[in-house]
A protein has these predicted regions:
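A structural boundary/capping signal
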Residues: 1-154
Length: 154
């Protein structure tokens, strides 16, 4: 699986403008990602778009959704939803340092806005991410509802 994920970090020729439908590499996305905490009481989920400063700004859910869309699915909504519905990819809720956190699992590997790299579950647990006993798979329907609410509240 590590070799399969390594291809997502290879250079992609052409423009580094990240709106492009073809997606981008993990390195490209990470270079343009900037953490932004949701305002209190507004937990909105988005696949992040470039802002005026040329950055992707969002929190842990936004990072996970955006890596899935831009890096893994290379800009394909069909593949994005297929991977979520078939549980080949999932957003995983965990507790960390006294708060909630979301990481992306794709195959046997995990990534979040702390690691910014594909790592094994044990590596996530070493960071303090507590998956057990209340490991929470965030269902695709929940993802869809949260993203729709994000659009409405936008």
């Amino acid at each position: 699986m590590v070799q399969a994920l390594a291809k997502y970090d290879l250079a992609v020729s052409g423009s580094t403008t990240c709106h492009r439908k073809t997606g981008m590499t993990l390195t490209e996305f990470n270079r343009l990602y900037d953490y932004k905490y949701d305002p209190k009481g507004r937990d909105v989920w988005f696949v992040i778009k470039l802002n005026e400063q040329g950055l992707y700004r969002g929190d842990c859910e936004d990072y996970s959704l955006s890596v899935l869309y831009y890096v893994v699915c290379q800009g394909s909504w069909l593949k994005f939803w297929w991977l979520l519905v078939t549980f080949q990819a999932e957003l995983c809720g965990c507790d960390t340092k006294g708060g909630g956190h979301v990481v992306l699992r794709y195959g046997d590997m995990y990534i979040d806005n702390w690691t910014k790299a594909w790592v094994e579950r044990e590596d996530m647990e070493e960071l303090g991410h507590d998956f057990w006993p209340w490991y929470k798979t965030i269902l695709p329907t929940t993802v869809a509802i949260k993203m729709a609410l994000g659009k409405i509240r936008g």
